[in-house]
Amino acid sequence: MNPNPRIAYVLKVYPRTSQTFVLSEILAHERAGLELDIFSLRRTDDTRFHAELAQVQSPVFQVARARSNATLTLNALREHAQHLPRLWDVVHNSQANAEDLLQAATLSRAIVERGIIHMHAHFGTVATVVARLASKITGISYSFTAHAKDIFHENVVEEVLRNKLADSSGVITVSRFNVNYLRDKYAEAAAGVKLIYNGLDLDKFPFDPDGDKLPLVLGVGRLVEKKGFSYLLDASALMRAKGIPFRCEIVGGGELEADLQEQVNKLDLGGHVTLCGAMSQSDVKQKIRQARLLAAPCVHAENNDRDGLPTILLESMALGTPCISTPVTGIPEVLKPGETGLMVAERDANALADACERLLTDQQLCTELALNGRRLIEDQFDINKNAAEIRALFSSMSGVDLSRGGDGGGT
């Protein structure tokens, strides 16, 4: 047995500012003593990074992509095949494209040389494609965490996802809704899907429901359709028309930024609404602490994309800022109407405006929601507890005891 067994995290892009849950998970594993290698299939184009990124001790490897022409790619595969006896069988029996095959071969060489005993990917897209191929090449097991777009989007090919589920040693997903969806749709292939919520390092999210709050309605997320921010702008126009004192700030960047700014201008909301662009996690936390409420008016997008369970809801509830959201996928598992938050129908700007007004004007309600929300987060979304569950799965799937001191992986 390898005296220092290692787990490989296979990610499409690392680091990625919007995927704080991956960073939190990696840091929790490291605190428990798990040795990790991080493999990134694409180079990040983010220009802002979270301060916690500097705490990651695990080595990060960029996996080389396909060569500039087919001949060079074939030559690279031939070179890898000298060290990977199963490679040509996988190439001939796979319908994967050349880039995925070459990255899988490169990854395979690395994980064998570095004593990797198991691979874990986040999102059932290219990271899982490459991990699955590498598993076939090396015989090293793989698992993945399914989130949202990777299982709901209209571009998801059912047979391809079914094969990823069936061939994996285990699948984690981030909401009970997702578990039921996958089991209903993929039957036996998804029978072993396990719910483990994305978690937070609660030491970094001190609870402060009675801080110096502004009449600020905050939205945080990528500027894409499924976040529903256009309805938050419509709700802002309704609140302004009623003379409610407030400001609305939306933090994040994305493909709809120009459209949302045009909507701000068209509704003449310049004095009430600001699109802030992307921010670091520390700056986002400060915004959450200042805000009276967090609005996440999520919707089912036209391409069937939707949120799984937005991390920003967990962060806001942990910090003591009450939330408003919609009954999309796993959100009702954390936002229980009138108990841990307020719920409105998706695409209903009037209901959203009314809910915002309630929280802007009812301090007692805000305090009650905040207290209940924090209790729920502590009970179900502590990253140290949830990462220990993940390590226990890694131990089971690899056949190697990965437990360390403290909570490290045992159940």
Region spans (language model):
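Conserved acidic donor-binding segment of nucleotide-sugar-dependent glycosyltransferases
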Residues: 336-338, 342-349, 358-364, 379
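N-terminal subdomain of nucleotide-sugar transferases
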Residues: 1-65, 112, 166, 170, ...
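Nucleotide-activated donor-binding/catalytic signature segment of Leloir-type glycosyltransferases, i.e.
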Residues: 261-282
